[in-house]
């Protein structure tokens, strides 16, 4: 099994090499060795990155690792490598950046972005906030007068005069606009006559059963009959009184798509 697979892989690689040689032979001479016409990475026979003629000694130093950038930007302790390894032996564990750093030490910031709370900030720049030493020269804010003292006192609703006035105003409103009440002499609305069957006699006090039933509740329709069960299902599920199903005669299925016997 393994030998046959190996032979098939060898034959595939040989055919791919022959196909590549046939294509490169048809290309012009100045473009035959160009990286743009290298199709080994497309067909998977060569390296994934078909980069040719790379001088490793002329490459810039690799970018610094994040652990080396924390030491205040000083690159004295770490010795940068002058040449990067080959393409095949490149170490992918460290992060690679698009723009390599050319070993320029990062300059520390000249002044902090936000001053600390303990040290007073010096008023060197124009438009800055006054320092703690110059706070005595700032005039205090003007004192606002008491607004509540200028307002009149609120009306007292607990006195008897105001309560009687409001009660009288409510009484006047009620007397001026009385509510519409039903007068005693107005005739009462006549109820609609009840539906009575023609052959009923109320004089004798006997009420027919149909009228009583119609006044009590509407007549309900009887439920529809249950659909009959199919014959085969009923024959299979039929059982004796003892619970054991008895073998009953099941009719043969009807063959519908058959030709009639001529």
From Swiss-Prot:
Native organism: Schizosaccharomyces pombe (strain 972 / ATCC 24843) (Fission yeast)
Taxonomic lineage: Eukaryota, Fungi, Dikarya, Ascomycota, Taphrinomycotina
Name of protein: Uncharacterized protein P8B7.26
Record keyword Cytoplasm present: yes
Keywords: Cytoplasm
Region Disordered, residue ranges: 1-262
Taxonomy, superkingdom: Eukaryota
Bias kind Low complexity: ranges: 92-105, 114-131, 157-169, 203-219, 235-248
A Gene Ontology term for the protein's cellular component: cell tip
Cytoplasm keyword on record: yes
Biased composition (Polar residues): 10-24, 170-184
Subcellular location: Cytoplasm
